[in-house]
Amino acid sequence: MAGAEWKSLEECLEKHLPLPDLQEVKRVLYGKELRKLDLPREAFEAASREDFELQGYAFEAAEEQLRRPRIVHVGLVQNRIPLPANAPVAEQVSALHRRIKAIVEVAAMCGVNIICFQEAWTMPFAFCTREKLPWTEFAESAEDGPTTRFCQKLAKNHDMVVVSPILERDSEHGDVLWNTAVVISNSGAVLGKTRKNHIPRVGDFNESTYYMEGNLGHPVFQTQFGRIAVNICYGRHHPLNWLMYSINGAEIIFNPSATIGALSESLWPIEARNAAIANHCFTCAINRVGTEHFPNEFTSGDGKKAHQDFGYFYGSSYVAAPDSSRTPGLSRSRDGLLVAKLDLNLCQQVNDVWNFKMTGRYEMYARELAEAVKSNYSPTIVKE
């Protein structure tokens, strides 16, 4: 399996394909070619100083007579943990806060309106270990924990909606842990939260040792810049999960994730892009970067030898549009900020062309699914 030595699919294609072939391959892989954003020089200089990649692309819609363009700039942040996983908890959280603050400041230079961080961004992705301490100490209140207060300041200072995925401790309901994304308005107020609907039980993804499936449904958040939803990590494998956010009105669905190359890298470029097409919305897939080493060996009942790391988190964050176009991915090996300029009018324009909502036959599937979940259900199989 390729680790950090392989930088990106795009770099590989550009290195080995002649230009005419490259253009055709990119047309198939990424849809229509997107215009690169002319981001401020000082933003690139700051990104260079802070050692993270900066890219920007624009998705454009057709000009309309009655509606003005509905422009929003989104920012996707991918990063590695700056300190070893065995560093003191408070030091790790502080280091991650500092790292994210530096990246958000560059996002503000680029005019970003909505920014989203990776899944469980304030900690190592330690759920592979099945150990409780010290990892549960990273859990915080979604409403007024230190990370939420930190993000509220960022949001207010930069007039930016912040999507902050954390490990939540719900003190109002028995100190239960949840995998949660907090949505903070550009006013600095906590707009609400959403929880991970689907919890993996595959390989080293031992997450159900810590938290279970979310209980908040599929909320969509009305922000000044558009309607957004957050489909956390493993939920991207479930088409109905994307569908319900779309049915509830989401125009942009963020997918903050933590996933490794051995398991999912061949799925990664497809799933969020397919969801954007199927649901007439923009999708934003975000993954962390690097290999995280833990103090103690662990196993996962899959026959593999005991080991001390989860695997390689391959980054490659990207944005996909309802017309099937998508940005190139960020690096597989570096921290990065991807800025995308979206015209939300494209959602309705594509809907009018393909009519997936109109032709979806939801009433038929609702009826059949209602029968399928009954204990006495028999599949409809026609036999001779």
Curated annotation (Swiss-Prot):
Strongly inhibited by 50 mM Zn(2+). Not inhibited by EDTA. Competitively inhibited by beta-alanine, 5-aminolevulinic acid (ALA), beta-aminoisobutyrate and 4-ureidobutyrate. Changing residue 132 to L: Loss of catalytic activity. Forms dimers, but no higher oligomers. Disulfide bonds: none annotated. Changing residue 235 to R: In UPB1D; complete loss of activity. Detected in liver (at protein level). Changing residue 208 to R: Loss of catalytic activity. Forms dimers, but no higher oligomers. It is found in: Cytoplasm. GO terms for biological process: beta-alanine biosynthetic process via 3-ureidopropionate; CMP catabolic process; dCMP catabolic process; dUMP catabolic process; in utero embryonic development; liver development; protein homooligomerization; protein homotetramerization. It holds the Pfam family CN_hydrolase. GO terms for cellular component: cytosol; extracellular exosome. CDD domains: ML_beta-AS. It is linked to Beta-ureidopropionase deficiency: An inborn error of metabolism due to a defect in pyrimidine degradation. It is characterized by muscular hypotonia, dystonic movements, scoliosis, microcephaly and severe developmental delay. Patients show strongly elevated levels of N-carbamyl-beta-alanine and N-carbamyl-beta-aminoisobutyric acid in plasma, cerebrospinal fluid and urine. This is Beta-ureidopropionase. It comes from Homo sapiens.
